[in-house]
Amino acid sequence: MPPIRANKAKEKLAAGQAVTTISGLSSSEIIDFMGPLGFDAAWIEGEHGSVTWEQLGDMTRACDLWEMAPITRVSANEPWLVTRTLDRGSMGIVVPHVNTKEAAEKAAQSAKYAPLGYRGMFGGRQSYGVGDYFQQANDQTMVIVLLEEDEALNNLDEILTVDHIDVFFVAPTDLAQTMGHLGNPGHPEVQRAIEGAIAKILSAGRVAGTLVNDENVGRFLGQGVKYTMTSWNAWVAQGAAAFLEKVAGTKI
């Protein structure tokens, strides 16, 4: 029997390479458009987006076609939600608001079968035709925890002791809110906190991730961030603005 599909993002992290993840995806058609561009993973939005369970299955299939790892952000750190998300074809989960060691342990154990955790025994789409699926799923499934509150940074030393977490992702926007800088993740205090968290993650021998854009991606990669997530929306907005400016400035 064939092996489970390889998780490209997890393989690149294991090789010490940077991973590129594209977000802002709401349909399988958009994933098909993004697929040929070469991103390693697709960030499917289950917390802030409108993706249904039926759509999630189709979107993860589209990721499989383009060898992009389907990584889905769930809306809560709940075992049943993690299980169903993985059963629908996701090869990784992003768990929001992980502020304590106990929350990190819950996230990791919800995504793994025994003896590593207690993910519900079913398997779903990625298990079809795969021998020894449960062990292979444990090897290929990614767990990403979001550090998006100042409480998480205060407890970071303990959180970093939790096994079977692939990426500790420092989320700037929510972090800024909890630090008293609503809507201003670029505030120097927030940026210092992000950089300090990244340094602590790396010093513990773990993988750091964060949100990046064209302006700061080089800086974060230089700091040692290996898991990057960005959105295509800004590129469309920039291109549209440039196009409209050219039209407005052309005499006819």
Regions found by a protein language model. Give the residues of each.
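Conserved N-terminal beta1-alpha1 strand-loop-helix module at the mouth
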Residues: M1-P70, V74-N77, V143, H164
